[in-house]
């Protein structure tokens, strides 16, 4: 739990750094690499151990520097020892109660943390199962080597997953070229790997808003990068912008 809290702190600081210094930059590929790098570094830093070697001077040297007589120090030591003996029972009881409370608190937090991670993992598994079912029940076409076009009869939002491009029959007939070019750009840029990394990290940092914001920023950069690739491929800019507007407003 301590490691996860340190990681959460690093992610929060790094996200603020990204938003302040790179949030408005249009170098999408660079921003993408920075986002991935910051996420990885945030998980590595808390695991680093810094060794500190402190050499305590000998007691005799301390006495010599302070010019304290040895007999006087022995008397003070005896008095301190007597005081410690009289308070040992009280301190022991307080430490035991504090230890029991700490163990109980950490145990509850641990169960809560694992419960949240488990729910998120189940959601991922359910989402993947739904994607596989959608692909299995749709028409599939080979396109550019290993790429598979998955055409569904129902009105599903276009998306790409691994080497699959999924879209509805209506989208294929109206804006097939633009949508396929956009989703193909996601596949070629290997955005799936970035999102997989973000989802795995989110399993461990589900309680941290910064990790959710990192994933959101990563998805935004992916969309900008894909749009840029589509326009470079020669797709009509006005028609593509109209498609983006329609998909944004849901018409």
Task: Name each model feature, range by range.
Residues 68-99:
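Low-complexity, acidic polar-rich segments
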């Amino acid at each position: 739990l301590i490691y996860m809290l340190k990681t959460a702190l690093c992610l929060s600081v790094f996200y603020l750094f990204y938003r302040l210094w790179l949030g408005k930059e249009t170098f999408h590929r660079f921003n993408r690499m920075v986002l991935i790098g910051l996420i990885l570094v945030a998980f590595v830093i808390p695991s680093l151990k810094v060794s500190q070697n402190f050499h305590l001077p000998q007691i005799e040297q301390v006495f010599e520097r302070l010019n304290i007589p040895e007999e006087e120090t022995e008397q003070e030591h005896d008095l301190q020892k007597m005081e410690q003996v009289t308070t040992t029972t009280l301190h022991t009881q307080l430490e035991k109660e504090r230890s029991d409370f700490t163990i109980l608190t950490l145990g509850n937090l641990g169960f809560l943390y694992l419960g949240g991670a488990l729910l998120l993992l189940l959601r991922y598994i359910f989402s993947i199962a739904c994607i596989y079912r959608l692909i299995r029940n749709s028409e599939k076409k080979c396109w550019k080597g290993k790429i598979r076009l998955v055409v569904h009869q129902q009105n599903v939002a276009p998306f790409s997953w691994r080497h699959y491009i999924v879209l509805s029959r209506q989208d294929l007939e109206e804006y097939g070229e633009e949508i396929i070019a956009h989703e193909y750009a996601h596949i070629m840029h290997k955005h799936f790997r970035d999102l997989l990394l973000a989802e795995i990290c989110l399993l461990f940092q589900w309680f941290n808003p910064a990790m959710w914001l990192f994933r959101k920023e990563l998805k935004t950069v992916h969309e900008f990068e894909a749009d840029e690739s589509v326009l470079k491929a020669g797709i009509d800019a006005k028609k593509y912008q109209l498609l983006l507007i329609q998909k944004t407003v849901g018409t």
